[in-house]
Design a protein with these regions (language model features):
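Aromatic (tryptophan-biased) beta-strands that constitute blades/sheets of beta-rich domains
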Residues: 1, 7-26, 66-82, 107-132, ...
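Extended, hydrophobic interaction surfaces within ordered domains
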Residues: 162-210, 353-354, 358-370
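Short, isolated positions in well-ordered beta-strands
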Residues: 49, 96-97, 103, 111, ...
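Ordered, small/hydrophobic-rich secondary-structure cores
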Residues: 112, 122-171, 176-178, 308-317, ...
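A short acidic/small-residue loop/turn micro-motif
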Residues: 26-27, 85-86, 118-119, 345, ...
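Compositionally biased, intrinsically disordered or flexible polar/acidic segments
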Residues: 210-370
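Short, solvent-exposed loop/turn and secondary-structure capping segments
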Residues: 31, 54-56, 194-197, 329
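Repeat-blade elements of multi-bladed beta-propeller folds
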Residues: 1-8, 22-68, 80-102, 125-150, ...
Length: 370
């Protein structure tokens, strides 16, 4: 008796003549149903209040939010399912993006990818930590949105949310791709958030990507199959082979991939960052990997398997650099894995030769049931 049945109509855009009509129950589309169409698919969904509702999202209060897709030619239902998205969806080509997930436009099947650590197939998702007013906008290859500041996502590179500081979009959709540029039109007047920056800002593309990203993945990052860590880095990034290097310590935020671990340093030790663009490089095609480091590291503990996963054997490769031109014998590293020293596992970076940056590797294996 309380069903919200509406009549969905398709009209010929030239003549205005009725092509088809279909009664549809829109109860699970909320109080403000909306529609969009692409590639012959009509998508019906609900528009809900904008705001910072992560607590409600994780509590499952949005689980009943439904999306329905109809064939635009005859009104036949292609699919209808509860998606539980956070803000209004958008379409890019044949993909429906319903934050934080993505779906095949014509089938509703969830888009998936391999987890960069476990190798298991997981749902594609992205993170929008911090203040995240408004809904995303998009171009064929990018998502644009607020995440603390200006946030954007390279859908082709697919390595996480990137940020541009000191600017922020307004409270709705004003960060827009236009003619090869990214335009943030003024939309802050009357907003009471910090740094309203009342003005229009236009960004043009650059040839060299120097941005760090925050990758998102569901669940535990165990058991580990392949883990590439970039110690001290400001974010995540893929190398030329496509391997995703994860920053450690991990950036924090809702839906950002988390790792269970702990680092301990000798006196004066710390994670540090530099700028690879201005550093001499040798022996690597990814100098950004050596623009950060764990200096004076005494111990790094990482959770590779969970209790009950059984025994696992791993091979470990470590990268070293010599950025301070120290003399041989001044900075000798002894490598201990699982409490056991490894034969020949002493590294003296100044003796390795090459250039300003070095990237030798040390290998070893051990078992871990903890």
């Amino acid at each position: 008796a309380n069903a919200k049945v509406r009549l969905v109509l398709c009209l010929n855009k030239s003549s205005g003549q009725l092509v088809w009509q279909k009664p549809l129950d829109l109860t699970e589309l909320g109080d403000t149903p909306a529609a969009m169409v692409n590639n012959g698919v009509l998508v019906l969904f609900g528009v809900y209040l904008d705001g910072h509702y992560w607590q409600q999202f994780f509590a499952g209060q949005f689980a009943g939010r439904r999306v329905t897709a109809l064939d635009g030619h005859d009104g036949k239902q292609l699919w209808s399912q509860q998606v539980g998205y956070r803000v209004r969806p958008l379409i890019i080509g044949d993909t429906l993006h319903a934050e934080p997930w993505a779906f095949d436009l014509k089938t509703g099947e969830a888009q998936k990818r391999a987890h960069p650590v476990t190798g298991e197939e997981e749902r594609w998702q992205f993170a929008r930590p911090g203040h995240h007013c408004g809904a995303p906008s998009a171009s064929p290859h990018m998502l644009f949105f607020r995440s603390w500041n200006l946030g954007y996502y390279d859908l082709d590179g697919d390595y996480g949310t990137m940020h541009f500081g000191a600017q922020r979009p307004g409270c709705w959709i004003n960060f827009l791709p236009v003619g090869g540029l990214a335009v943030m039109a003024e939309a802050s007047t009357g907003c009471m958030c910090d740094f309203p920056n009342q003005g229009t800002v236009v960004f043009q593309p650059v040839r060299e990507n120097k941005a760090w990203a925050w990758f998102s993945a569901p669940g535990l990052a165990t058991p580990v199959k392949d883990l590439a860590l970039n110690l001290g880095a400001l974010g995540d990034r893929r190398d030329a082979s496509g391997k995703l290097w994860l920053a450690y310590p991990r950036p924090s935020g809702s839906l950002v991939l988390a790792l269970e671990g702990e680092a301990a340093f000798y006196a004066g030790g710390r994670f540090s960052q530099g700028e690879s663009v201005y550093a001499e490089t040798a022996g690597t095609d990814a100098p950004w990997l050596f623009s950060s480091a764990a200096t004076g590291l005494r111990k790094l503990s990482l959770r590779l398997v969970q209790p009950g996963d059984g025994t696992a054997t791993y091979r470990v490769r470590l990268g070293f650099s010599e950025p301070v031109h120290s003399a041989p014998g001044q900075r000798v590293f002894d490598i201990v894995l699982q409490g056991q020293g490894k034969p020949g596992a002493s590294i003296d970076p100044p003796t390795l030769g090459g250039g300003f940056w070095y990237s030798p590797t040390i290998t070893g294996s051990w078992s871990d049931e903890r």
